[in-house]
């Protein structure tokens, strides 16, 4: 088990988790009652298997922990808790954190600098998050730090490093790669036209295939209306991989809302 040289707060086990309150966020509002029940069951197992560790004075409570667990389990709702194997701890800073980053350039020189990170994940090792960006992950805006890092973990199940191609049947790999690169190019074209700040999809998606998969996974679950119509072929591949269709949930929820309004008249 990793020992960290600073004082940390761990969430205790056997909590009486406030699931009803934890579910009351825009990200989860379109789940059916059956999906919510299964998500809670997965989140309970997640909290039994993983340590949530608060760093640098940040304080966890049962509601924060329950919501974190629910979001962690949303991408694996139809895949199973075993898809989150490979790490045992979630480290949570109060805000984005500074790390020492090293990289090698084209001629072999190694460079290093201090950079601010929102989150990090590795194939073997903890997931590192920060509370400010977790808070921004509760809505349905297309941004979700937890889903982003979970997507990297799912991606890395297919090899030593994230490639943008998760563990899918071999026959589907070429098509997935083609559609993912087409999406990256389309996003880059929009960035070139309107600039990063005005792009409708986070510009980070154009960085490389691994980041494209992670960023579009955020949109898949939290803003399907921005993903599905723009990249319909890739959307279907995401639906097949995650075994979910958030766009369909959104349509059903909207239809039920319209029906309810008509019934009141």
From Swiss-Prot:
Disulfide feature: none
Cofactor-binding details, from the entry: Binds 1 zinc ion per subunit.
Subcellular location field: Cytoplasm
Chief place of localization: cytoplasm
Superkingdom of origin: Bacteria
Keywords: Aminopeptidase, Cytoplasm, Hydrolase, Metal-binding, Metalloprotease, Protease, Zinc
UniProt cofactor(s): Zn(2+)
Residues that hold Zn(2+) according to the record: 111, 148, 152, 211
GO process annotations (BP): proteolysis
Role of this protein: Involved in the modulation of the activity of the glucose-phosphotransferase system (glucose-PTS). Interacts with the transcriptional repressor Mlc, preventing its interaction with DNA and leading to the modulation of expression of genes regulated by Mlc, including ptsG, which encodes the PTS system glucose-specific EIICB component. Shows zinc-dependent metallopeptidase activity.
HAMAP family per the UniProt record, alphabetical: MtfA
Protein name listed in UniProt: Mlc titration factor A
The organism of origin for this protein: Salmonella agona (strain SL483)
């Amino acid at each position: 088990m990793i020992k960290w040289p600073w004082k940390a707060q761990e969430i205790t086990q056997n909590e009486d988790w406030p699931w009803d309150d934890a579910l009351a966020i825009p990200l989860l509002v379109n789940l059916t009652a059956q999906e919510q029940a299964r998500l809670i069951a997965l989140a309970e197992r997640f909290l039994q298997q993983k340590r949530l560790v608060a760093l640098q004075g940040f304080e966890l409570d049962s509601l924060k922990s329950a919501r974190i667990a629910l979001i962690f389990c949303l991408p694996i709702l139809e895949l199973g808790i075993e898809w989150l194997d490979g790490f045992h701890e979630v480290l949570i800073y109060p805000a984005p954190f500074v790390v020492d980053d090293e990289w090698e350039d084209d001629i072999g020189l190694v460079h290093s600098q201090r950079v601010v990170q929102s989150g990090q994940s590795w194939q073997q090792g903890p997931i590192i998050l920060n509370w400010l960006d977790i808070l921004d992950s509760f809505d349905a805006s297309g941004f979700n730090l937890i889903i982003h890092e979970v997507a990297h973990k799912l991606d890395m199940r297919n090899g030593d490093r994230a490639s943008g191609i998760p563990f899918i049947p071999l026959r589907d790999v070429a098509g997935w790669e083609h559609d993912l690169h087409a999406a990256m190019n389309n996003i880059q074209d929009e960035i070139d036209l309107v600039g990063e700040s005005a792009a409708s999809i986070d510009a980070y998606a154009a960085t490389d295939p691994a980041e494209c998969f992670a960023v579009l996974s955020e949109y898949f679950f939290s803003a399907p209306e921005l993903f599905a119509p723009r990249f319909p072929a890739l959307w279907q591949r995401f639906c097949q991989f995650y075994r979910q269709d958030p766009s369909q949930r959104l349509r059903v929820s909207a239809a039920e809302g319209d029906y309810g309004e008509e019934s009141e008249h």
